[in-house]
């Protein structure tokens, strides 16, 4: 019986959590580290106390359990926090600090000091959107971003070791923080470090998030970033293999945001592997997808690559 089926039956959530925790050989304090006190964890498992929705969701994700079948009434403050997080996330994706930074300020005013999950989200968003200096919005330096992101991950994983990611337990948001750390190392030209992080993350996602539908976007994201690093370091055959893993995940989970870029990356790798006909085939697919979703920026980048590698020897 799968855990998704267990949650649908008449088991209270604490019983499901306790069963899975014991199955994984975890102590209560290990599971709830950075989220809540062990005594709260004990009360949760015995049905005597229910934590906030965000804390419960994080615990379930760390256990690799689906969190989409747990429903709770939210307080007014929790609803406001959730709404602000949704708006800020949109600003992160659209790279819109003008709208995002004021929303972060609003969130900071209402978050409780012991709400490590929301504080982690705030730090991650600041690393993405930047800061205000003398009335101007400026990005953080790469080293400042690293400091912010390590502070963020250690709010909920105090003993986090970037060289031993597999030793920890992480939620979806925690994996996003670690992924962001890897992108900063890449920007610092520390590609070997970034590759090691992505290797560990991909392994973790495959093992721990099989039952969590909401994690579907993580594998395409991490696989694309991992393949890009391999491409940058000339490991083209490996890059194709990882990119194809990301492609399959895009289709499996219905998460297509990274699909055109993933296919374009495969195309570039085949060019460097001296397989230009195969490369052109993949470039055409990527170009069609970028055009289909009206991603003019992506299409422009692809056309520039095609011109660079093939000149006029390319027919759409």
Describe the residue ranges of each PLM region.
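Amphipathic alpha-helical segments of tetratricopeptide repeats
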Residues: 104-111, 150-163, 199-210, 244-255, ...
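DNA major-groove recognition helix of helix-turn-helix/homeodomain DNA-binding modules
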Residues: 54-69
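Short alpha-helical DNA-recognition segment
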Residues: 23-43
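A short, Lys/Arg-rich alpha-helix, primarily the initiator
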Residues: 2-23
């Amino acid at each position: 019986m799968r855990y998704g089926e267990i949650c649908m039956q008449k088991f209270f959530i604490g019983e499901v959590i306790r069963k899975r925790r014991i199955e994984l050989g975890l102590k209560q304090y290990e599971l709830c580290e950075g989220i809540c006190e062990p005594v709260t964890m004990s009360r949760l498992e015995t049905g005597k106390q229910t934590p906030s929705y965000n804390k419960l969701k994080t615990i379930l994700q760390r256990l690799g359990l689906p969190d989409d079948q747990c429903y709770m009434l939210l307080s007014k403050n929790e609803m406001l926090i959730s709404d602000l997080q949704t708006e800020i996330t949109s600003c992160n994706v659209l790279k819109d600090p003008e709208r995002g930074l004021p929303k972060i300020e609003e969130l900071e005013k209402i978050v409780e000091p012991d709400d490590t999950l929301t504080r982690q989200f705030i730090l991650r968003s600041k690393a993405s959107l930047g800061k205000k200096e003398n009335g101007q919005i400026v990005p953080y330096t790469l080293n400042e971003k690293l400091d912010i992101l390590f502070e963020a991950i250690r709010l909920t994983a105090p003993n986090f070791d970037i060289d031993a990611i597999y030793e920890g337990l992480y939620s979806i948001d925690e994996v996003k923080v670690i992924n962001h750390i890897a992108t900063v190392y890449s920007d610092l030209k520390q590609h070997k470090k970034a590759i090691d992080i992505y290797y560990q993350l991909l392994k973790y996602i495959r093992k721990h998030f099989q039952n969590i539908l909401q994690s579907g976007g993580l594998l395409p994201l991490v696989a694309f970033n991992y393949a890009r690093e391999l491409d940058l370091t000339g490991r083209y055959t490996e890059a194709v293999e990882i990119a194809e893993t990301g492609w399959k995940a895009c289709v499996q989970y219905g998460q297509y945001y990274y699909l055109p870029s993933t296919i374009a990356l495969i195309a570039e790798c085949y060019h460097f592997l001296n397989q230009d006909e195969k490369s052109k085939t993949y470039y055409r697919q990527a170009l069609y997808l970028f055009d289909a979703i009206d991603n003019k920026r992506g299409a422009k980048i692809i056309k520039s690559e095609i011109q660079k590698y093939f000149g006029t020897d390319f027919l759409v």
